[in-house]
């Protein structure tokens, strides 16, 4: 999108935020992530990056239904080193688009071992002076995608056009979320994991192939060493459902995010049970 000046961009962002009932900061963050994603799609590395995580979920269900502040990707065809990733992102930042935004790499660091996927975290800045937005991109490698990544058509926030990017298929997105919920059990402190499973299945469940989801979950648990959840899920879900701590965390989450306010913790637990029963029975 071409704007006359930063103030006009802020006005567009403010209007979109009001329309979507989310904060202007979230819209600005997602707009800048979209600008980066388009650069990836136009770079020589288009077929090396595979989109996953919250930004993909937001694209699937809608920004007004799920917002995120960072970009999660997996990369193929490269050895994951600080030097390689810095070179790749420096080249991506140099891709010129008529959107008035300039990107710079601020830093490269390792993702903590305690996170879902060990990998590399890239800190960037998106600049449209005086606007400066810090961005984070997490890059992993060797992820288990079942059966394979797909070509995803990404609709832009303000322009009536799309970009094409490689992404996780729906079944792999759901499989990873289900594994996270079940393996972490009551130690999970992220209500958004429950929300993501619920909203993905509510809005896109009819498109989900149960046999593929079953296989994706099997392969994900094999990779993460959590195969016991496939048989123990009824007991795990009972423990989760009865957890006062998780219920309170959910209630706080649903108060903070307008899109979750009409969904109860019971709803999310019932959705997870429904999916697991459908693919495991």
Predicted feature locations:
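Structured mid-to-C-terminal alpha-helical surface segments
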Residues: 1-49, 59-67, 71-281
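Catalytic metal-binding/acid-base residues of hydrolase active sites
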Residues: 56
């Amino acid at each position: 999108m071409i704007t006359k000046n930063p103030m006009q961009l802020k006005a567009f962002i403010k209007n979109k935020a009001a329309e979507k009932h989310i904060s202007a900061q979230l819209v600005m963050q997602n707009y800048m992530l979209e600008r980066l994603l388009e650069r990836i799609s136009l770079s020589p590395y288009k077929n090396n990056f595979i989109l996953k995580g919250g930004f993909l979920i937001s694209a699937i269900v809608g920004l007004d239904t799920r917002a995120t502040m960072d970009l999660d990707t997996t990369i193929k065809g490269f050895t994951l080193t600080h030097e390689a990733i810095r070179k790749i992102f420096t080249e991506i930042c140099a891709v010129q688009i008529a959107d008035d935004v300039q990107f710079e790499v601020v830093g490269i660091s390792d993702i903590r071992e305690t996170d879902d996927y060990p990998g590399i975290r890239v800190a960037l800045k998106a600049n449209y002076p005086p606007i400066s937005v810090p961005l984070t991109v997490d890059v992993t490698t060797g992820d288990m995608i079942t059966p394979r990544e797909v070509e995803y058509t990404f609709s832009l926030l303000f322009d009536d056009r799309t970009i094409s990017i490689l992404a996780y298929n729906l079944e792999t997105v759901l499989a990873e979320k289900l594994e996270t919920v079940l393996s972490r059990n009551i130690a999970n402190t992220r209500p958004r994991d429950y929300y993501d499973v619920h909203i993905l299945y509510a809005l896109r469940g009819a498109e989900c192939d149960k046999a593929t989801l079953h296989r994706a979950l099997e392969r994900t648990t094999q990779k993460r060493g959590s195969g016991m959840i496939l048989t123990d899920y009824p007991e795990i879900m009972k423990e989760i459902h009865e957890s006062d701590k998780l219920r309170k965390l959910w209630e706080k989450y649903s108060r903070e995010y307008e899109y979750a306010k009409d969904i109860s913790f019971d709803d999310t637990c019932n959705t997870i049970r429904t999916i697991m029963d459908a693919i495991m029975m």
